[in-house]
Amino acid sequence: MVSPESNPEPTKMAAFLQFVAVSAVAGIVAAGLAIPGVGVATASANSAVEIFNALPATLEERDLGEKSTMLAADGSKIADFYWQNRVEVPLDEISQEMQDATIAVEDYRFFEHGGIDLEGIARAAVHNMVSSTTQGGSTLTQQYVKNVLAENAHAESNREGVEAARESEGTAGYARKLREAKLAVAVEKKYDKKEILNRYLNINNYSGSPNVYGVQAAAYRYWGIDAKDLNIQQSAMLAGIVQNPSAFNPERFPDAVLERRNVVLGQMLKYGHITQKEYDEAVKTGLDLNIKETPNGCSAAENSAAFFCNYVVNVIKNDESFGKTVEDRIATLQRGGLTIKTSLNPDIQKIADKEVKKRVPVGDPSGAGHALVTIEPGTGEVIAMAQNREYTEGEVEKKDKNKKTNINYTVDKKHNGGAGFQVGSTWKPFVLATWLKSGKSLNASVNATKRNFPASSWKYSGCPNMAGDWDPSNAGDGSGKGSMTVLNATKNSVNTGYAAMGNQLNMCKIMETAMDLGIRYGSGEKLDFADKSGFIQALSPSSILGTTETTPIAMAAAFATFANDGEFCGPKPILEIKDRNGKNIDVPGEECKQVLDKDVARGVAYALTQTFKGGTTSGLGIGVPAGAKTGTTNFEVGHTWLLGFTKTLSTAVWTGDPRGTRDWRKNGKGKVSGQIYGATISGKTWQAFMSKAVKETKGNTGFPKPSSKYFQGGGSGGGGSSSTGTNRGGGGGNGGGGGDRGNGGGGGNGGGGGNGGGGNGGDGGGDNGGGGDEAPGLGGN
């Protein structure tokens, strides 16, 4: 609007509009609304009517901002999300006392006028012309219009529009009043009185700060009850707040609110809504507040599910069905009144949270991260998600770096995670699946002797060649076992055996298998993504031993495929979404699909069940049939894993440095404390968690045995030579992604392209299993 300094007309216009307002008594506004029996006498009045008639006659009413609620699978609440804390309810769920109190104090002639109360306008206009104080004169319908206009501006982040909707001074104030009057009449024609009253009670601000909108949210905030249960004095208090929510905030100004409440009680008595006895009893009472919080967002998530909550929020933020932009999607969550039922199992989540924090406590001086995620085979439903940090949505102070984070260690960057972690020997099942897909057997023999694999020996058909000479080693740089079966190489996680297997396969096919099983880099890029130098990590020979960086949730979903006869189901954290009207909204996610032949999946599952029988997961049994794989990168990289599954649960457990690389053989004072393998920390957590979690599920039967063709003997050791590595290209010299210490696991010293990455150690437990006991935590004193 043009300011008075730049335009001399506003003073005249203000006077004119004031005249229009006062002239309503004489019928000018009424005439403009074609109210029978009212005439127009003057040219000025005619002009006023013309201006009035030119005002907008249709009120745009959007859905009110209403809080959304996230639920666990059993219907228990995880968190609320809101821009305005509001829950809309129909009029029959609002007490009659609340309806009466509102009408008595705000518009006692509500059921008599048609949206504009000429008597009220006249009274207010005359008062305002002769007094230094002002009266409003607005009907309840006009107030509703004002709130709708402000709400619309809020939804558009239009601050000027909000101010304009509430302007009360000068020309702008009179213009607003006229606009409201015109629109109020339109509203009265559109709705009956009860509908208008219902909408009014749902849109009002009943606090100021914290924001409480609508009578249902207000009833819960101040007394922990529903709007239908509000009594006389409670209703009077709420009705009195509306005049000035900030000044009449019960939590900040109880004395002023009590005085205002009693004024409302007087109005209720005056207009016959309560008896003298009811009035006398009500004014003697206090406010008797029983404040109930409605936490907003994932920080206050229940069931220790803050990181899962944040994951679900990011699933919504990434889905265009909730809005064109991220901002639109956030608005849908905070204003849409959604009910989001998730896959989280609260009982299993509690077990996960307890076991993760027991093994590596929050604030452990080592700074080690420890995380777990569980997926249901056959559905992809995310059952539990935990890590040894407190969730925060703000910046983390340096002193709290080992205690708090806003990063979810189990997911990718797209879902507020990190860049992922090297997975070590948990990558080997992808090599094994490719081996079986190519028609080879679990009983085929491979040459596990430590040796160099020249760049020229690697096979690439259909993708870029990333090979370099490679000289992988086993745990402790020990010698290989010579000829061994693929089953034994898997059972004991022998790096050199798997290098020989990979050397016989098309590296492109290994990468394709991993991609079919849902594996991406933690950055979110596909596995065939090339960096600035053109290097593709997932095609490097060292990737056979796990130098690829991905996420625990992706690995859990991939391993679930082995338990589910080759059918892959991507992570699915949301079961159902309903809008404010109870209508179903499409749930983000893809359908499950068959990505491996059933027999191939069964072959991999069978091999992984054998790791419990004298292999790298010996001593980690959980009392039901299970398959598992340990994983350890080289100590300088510092990530250890346990991936394992039953027919009902697939769980990934990770331990490592979330901020970079760290040698976990050293404690906080730099002293060597011993080797850390996948079975040492991650394995213990997996065992403790799964042994309890499987009791919460049904159907943990054994796995179907694969076809006999996968148990036929034969095969050869494949390429390689005794020459030393050349540190060339992606293959690296002395490389590997780590191995598993069992009967010959381990890794090399480098890999990953040059001298980096790779593995120098493994996962262990060996034949006697378990990796030994350890005190909770990894740090120093």
Language model feature labels by segment:
Residues 104, 139-146, 197-200, 229, ...:
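Structural recognition of the beta-strand scaffold that forms the well-ordered cores
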Residues 78-87, 213-218, 246-250, 330-334, ...:
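Short pre-catalytic segments that frame enzyme active sites
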Residues 57-67, 72, 135-143, 148-174, ...:
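Extracytoplasmic/periplasmic proteins that interact with beta-lactams or build/remodel peptidoglycan
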Residues 1-69:
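N-terminal type II signal-anchor transmembrane helix
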Residues 707-781:
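Proline/serine/threonine-rich low-complexity "mucin-like" segments in extracytoplasmic/periplasmic regions
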Residues 64-275, 491-495, 502-506, 518-520:
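Peptidoglycan glycan-strand catalytic modules in the bacterial/periplasmic cell-wall system
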Residues 104-117, 130-136, 187-193, 205-211, ...:
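Bacterial peptidoglycan biogenesis and beta-lactam-recognition machinery
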